[in-house]
Amino acid sequence: MRRKTAALAAALLLALFPCTALAAPSTSAQAYAVVDGETGRVLFSKNAEEKLPMASTTKVMTCLVALERCSLDEIVTVDPAAAGLEGTSMYLSAGETLTVSDLLYGLMMSSGNDAAAALAYHIAGGIEQFAALMNQKAQEIGAESTHFVNPHGLPAEGHYTTASDLAKIAAYALKNQAFARIVSTKSMDLPADDDSPARYL
């Protein structure tokens, strides 16, 4: 499972930047797609259409959907179902209020599963409803071999993508200036307020 996830993560990273290499990469990855970040042209691939679990690379689509449906200064109240979610976290508390911007930085910089769920409940009222929005966006992008079940990437039946689709999603997301800014941020301090502690991401 870890090797499959790493392969898809590699595909995402390779999609983020223009690639001028002339030799196929030397890797043990089960699947990959090396694309030119400017043109979208596939340079090299291996098992690029194989459906695999996508783990935290799920959050690329979560971030994209949130950016297209919310303003960054919109206030989110953390749903109890999002607080304390297993796995990587930005340590949200039920009832805490943060901006969409804060949650997106926690989502992408801390890989916060709780941030993903908090955004899902805020935007769509639930995990299943938000996953439907993610699947709708995937179809719009042309990622036809991708299916989302949740916004965070925790293991779930029917939650999968391909290296090829992941590259398409990443390339599309990077056209969004806010997304590009978030994923290029190295560190961030979120100051404390009345009901939220200070956080360092």
Please name every model-derived segment:
Residues P80-A94, M134-H147:
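Active-site helix/loop module of the DD-peptidase/beta-lactamase fold
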Residues K51-T57, A94-S101, M109-N113, A124-A132, ...:
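Soluble non-cytosolic domains of exported or imported proteins
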Residues S26-A29, G126-L201:
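Penicillin-recognizing serine hydrolase domain
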Residues E68-A81, Q177-T185:
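Short, well-structured active-site flanking segments
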Residues A23-S45:
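A short, well-structured edge-of-sheet supersecondary motif
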Residues T39-G40, P53-T77, L166:
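Active-site SXXK
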Residues E86-A117, A198-L201:
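Conserved catalytic neighborhood of penicillin-recognizing serine enzymes
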Residues R2-A23:
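Sec-dependent N-terminal signal peptides of Gram-positive bacterial secreted proteins and lipoproteins
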